[in-house]
Every structure is written in structure tokens, then in C-alpha cells.
């Protein structure tokens, strides 16, 4: 048995890629898209016809140049997501633009539009997760969307305050980041960590512990892995989203995997809900989380801007 096969017995494996060939090869349950992955798709032969067809339709439907670009981003995200749903049994995560991370109402409106586009392609909302940054406004948007039957994936999650706010809001899934947490600590300390001491692994284990101990329904999906050791350190987490390079490492080695995360039982009562003031204070007091959340939003926004420039050039 390969390590990938062994891991799939302990955690649901999600492909952190939009590459159709990689998805076919590794057979994940779920997959994800974001502006960075859509940019990479421009270099993948499997998507060229889809890109050409989508942009031609946008040009035919819309005259205003900026409106064309905005619509092209949405339609392309959904077109790629729709292709991916043909290859997986589960869901595809589709991202709300990072520039909307502090606007609850605009995030909700964008989510509605993405779901509408999926439904026009015959893909029901039960096959889609709307991906939002774990800001206070993003979490509040997700809370409303969940009430409407639109389930969400809260990303760029680096702190216990963010996780608890998501649990309180009843969001479907959160994506606490491993690699970026560890990157920050390595840069600050110059230290190398074993998987057991790895700050990102320790953080996600704590999030899993809270979710399990207090019986929150939210799915925890470890994300942003740098090494195979980090992945193995979270074996047993509800879900793990893994890049093709690390999926290949896991597939190329034989052997069993030890469960590192287990159900820790039932607390007699839940934690008190975290309000906005406590959320913002908790985030403020965590320098790593504050810096990494801001950096992550900027990175996604930069990728979105690059994608928009590329689309504007193609749309003419």
C-alpha cells in the first residue's frame, strides 16, 4: 500500500490544484481553484479550448471593457470548477475575490453570482464550496450564506480566534494553514522543526482538538503544506488539501501511516461565542496571524490583478 492510499484511509484527500491531469491521476475526493491556479491553467493544454470558448462568449455578451473582465473572471472560475466536478465525487471550492475580504455584502453578492453560474451549467450548489478569507466580514458573509444553503470554505486561517469565530458561525469547512505558519516562525527564529514540533502542525492539531472536543460540526481541512512530514503529522485530520508534488511523494513511497489526530471526546459544554471585539483583539495579539492574513489577502489580490490584466489583453 502506498502512503497516499494509507493516508486516504485516515483523512479525506483534496487536490490543491486545478490541473485536470493531476486530478485524474491522484483521484482526490475534492479539489479547489483560486486566481493563482487559474493563471497556471493558461499554460495547461487541457484548458485552452475552455478558455477560448468562455472569453468568446463574454465578448459577445458584454460591451463594457471592465465589466467584461469582471465577468470573465467569474465565468472562467466556474467553467474550470465545472470541469473539475466531472472528475471528482465531492466538491470544488471556488474563491470570492480577495479584494472583497472586508465587504460582507459584496462577498455575499459575489457568492450568489458564482452559484448562479454553476447552476446555469447544471452544477448544483451541493457540489460547490464558496471560498472566503477568514476576516470578520468574510465569516459573517459565510454565516449568512450557510443559512441559504450555500456552504463555505474559510481560508487564510492562522489563529484560534479565526477558527472559533468560524465554529460559532456554523461554516461548513475551514482551511487552517500549516506551511505559512511555519514559514513565519522559521524566519523569526532561524530554527528547523521536526514534524512533532512544527508550529503549523501544532496549530492545526489544536484547531482539530477544539473542533472535536466541543463537538463543532465544521470540517477542518489542513492546508498549505511544505513537506510530506507536515502532512503525515496531521494524519487523521478531517481533510488535507495537498499539492500534486506532495501527492506524488506520497504515492511513490510504500508503508503504513500512524494516526496523529483522533476524536478526543465530548466536552460538557461549548466555548462561549467570540464577539467582534474579542476576535479583533485575539488577531491583533497574534503577530504571526495578523501578518500572514494580511499577506495572504495581498497575494491573492495580486494574483487576481494579474489574471485580470491577462484577460483584459485577451478580450481586447
UniProtKB/Swiss-Prot annotation:
Major localisation: cytoplasm
Gene Ontology MF terms: transaldolase activity
Keywords: Cytoplasm, Pentose shunt, Schiff base, Transferase
Catalyzed reactions: D-sedoheptulose 7-phosphate + D-glyceraldehyde 3-phosphate = D-erythrose 4-phosphate + beta-D-fructose 6-phosphate
Keyword Ligase: no
EC number(s) on file: 2.2.1.2
One annotated GO biological process: carbohydrate metabolic process
Protein's cellular compartments: Cytoplasm
Gene Ontology CC terms: cytosol
Active site per UniProt: 131 (schiff-base intermediate with substrate)
InterPro entries: Aldolase_TIM (IPR013785), TAL/FSA (IPR001585), Transaldolase_1 (IPR004730), Transaldolase_AS (IPR018225)
Pathway assignment: Carbohydrate degradation; pentose phosphate pathway; D-glyceraldehyde 3-phosphate and beta-D-fructose 6-phosphate from D-ribose 5-phosphate and D-xylulose 5-phosphate (non-oxidative stage): step 2/3
Xref: Gene3D superfamilies: Aldolase class I
Protein family according to the UniProt entry: Belongs to the transaldolase family. Type 1 subfamily.
Assembly notes: Homodimer.
Role played: Transaldolase is important for the balance of metabolites in the pentose-phosphate pathway.
Name of this protein: Transaldolase
Native source organism of the sequence: Chromohalobacter salexigens (strain ATCC BAA-138 / DSM 3043 / CIP 106854 / NCIMB 13768 / 1H11)
